[in-house]
């Protein structure tokens, strides 16, 4: 499990930068996922590169020893991130490798990844009395226990590289295609632009990411081969054998190259529909890839505006496919395109998976795992905010608002369309009176009012209306998924232990307080789309 802990909320959104958050945020937001991983039996934990309130995580004994091992009960191995022990010198908390090694070891770090600090620094630390042999033995025992569990004493090379048959590789490609298709989020589908009609005979696939198989790998592809990745163009050519697929990149992602805009617009004129593939290069996401501007890089906006303008004049639909590792702030494109898919970086079968969704072989079923911002000034934006004493109120100027933008995200957490059309009704919650040892059952009816079989995701949120500390307006407590044919009805049932209503009290310990809790169920975190019932905690 990594990276422990609070690796995300860095200063100015720059990776590796300092973190300074409240104890409450640490307890409520960042530690629970590690507690769950430990309960599931995770074998190793990696500390973050960052410091938290001035203490580098690699040397943070209070969090690694007291919290992680002592309070959360972690008994496995702690392994440093790449060179992070040596980087304690740059943090300014160690003068040399011996001091750095001593700080990390005393914090509970068992394995030094690539810094050479333990190999070169621990002998000096031991000689200077900075660490004891007993402390070294403690970490050695944890490492040896893990090796024993993995069977490495009997077979040091187990699970080494082995060849795979064509049949096994084929099954892996099939799985990769299915997983990729299920990861595509449809943000917009005006006038049922998608799926593409089976009668389409000329299709323009425009943009620098339309025929870019290597970009489909995304960041951190490690040992992935250069060949064998399917681009959008290749996927559509394979899926539509009777359709002429015309490709024009238009512009590059970053560099100023010879202008292909005219060729792209000619392709639009000749086509019945346009698939516009824009977004980030793979290297713009992942580690050490923070961006200050979250629009389309390079001249892609110029291309997209030209394509959308020409298509509108010609009366032809534009389907925008966004490739990105983060939400891109492109409200102008969302407005002007007829349909919008978020394809992230889908891997080796990306092009085939995108084609499956575009032609309707697969109904999109993924949902946004974040709140999608309208503007940079909204970041960070999330659904679990506290109400504050002056929540937004259009009739009162002295409330929490922007002068130049709406408070709400462009798309709420959990947003995502499909080729079905779903309606939720008849929310039931039992029991109404809930004690700490109870489990509540939440049931909601779902009907597919559309013309295609599709999946709907149902989210379960809670809101504690009155408590000893201000509670978030929404907290995610569970989710379920159901597949329904046209006209079919079904029921989603979710069960929730009442202990899920515990929260961090004013004294920073867990409390279960009596009172009313709202149970909210719906397709996303937009309050207006949620059905609501309530239970009484006692």
For each feature predicted by the language model, list its residue ranges:
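Glycoside hydrolase catalytic-domain context in secreted enzymes
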Residues: 1-505, 513-527
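Short beta-strand elements
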Residues: 527-538
